[in-house]
Amino acid sequence: MRLRLLVSAGMLLVALSSCLPCRALLSRGSVPRAPRAPQPLNFLQPEQPQQPQPVLIRMGEEYFLRLGNLNRSPAARLSPNSTPLTAGRGSRPSHDQAAANFFRVLLQQLQMPQRSLDSRAEPAERGAEDALGGHQGALERERRSEEPPISLDLTFHLLREVLEMARAEQLAQQAHSNRKLMEIIGK
């Protein structure tokens, strides 16, 4: 158990750590596909898109490490308002449908802006903000009105959905292993 945990932690550290470019490779100037030396920052040029970071996703009892664009996931095949709960309590969602719903929920969570815990300002700080100007306060209120409300009900609903999908996946794996066992014993 400890060995598996150490190996998993080591793999995650290697996969998620940012590697510095090798200077020997950077010195090769005209070699095709060779990385170039980092350029100094120029604030007049438009910012280039950042490379996507790997995302660790847990489905059932397995962990997947997704690299690249999360928008190109199986979630694109489903409509945005389909959930495993709308399919009915009696019918179990298929593995692909459960995975697609999980990716859809994950994408929704990633697209929500993160709020800081200390977003409330002290009364003295609020007075100082009012003294700075009403324009800045109006921009802040406008930005806040655009953010979707984050509620505990939504969080617990998503948690229940993910747990239900994990439970369904675990039951499917158990049924598959039971079928294999019965085939072996039946022979």
Curated annotation (Swiss-Prot):
GO CC list: extracellular region; extracellular space; neuronal cell body; neuronal dense core vesicle lumen; perikaryon; synapse; varicosity
Tissues where this protein is expressed: Expressed in parvocellular paraventricular nucleus of the hypothalamus and in medial accessory olivary nucleus.
PROSITE patterns: CRF
Region (Disordered): 75-94, 114-146
Domain of life of the source: Eukaryota
Gene Ontology molecular function: any one: hormone activity
Pfam families in alphabetical order: CRF
Gene3D superfamilies according to UniProt: 6.10.250.1920
Induction: Up-regulated during water-avoidance stress.
Isoleucine amide modification, residue list: 185
Keywords, alphabetical: Amidation, Cleavage on pair of basic residues, Hormone, Secreted, Signal
Record note on quaternary structure: Interacts (via C-terminus) with CRFR1 (via N-terminal extracellular domain).
Protein function: Hormone regulating the release of corticotropin from pituitary gland. Induces NLRP6 in intestinal epithelial cells, hence may influence gut microbiota profile.
Protein name: Corticoliberin
Lineage, top ranks: Eukaryota, Metazoa, Chordata, Craniata, Vertebrata
The gene coding this protein: Crh
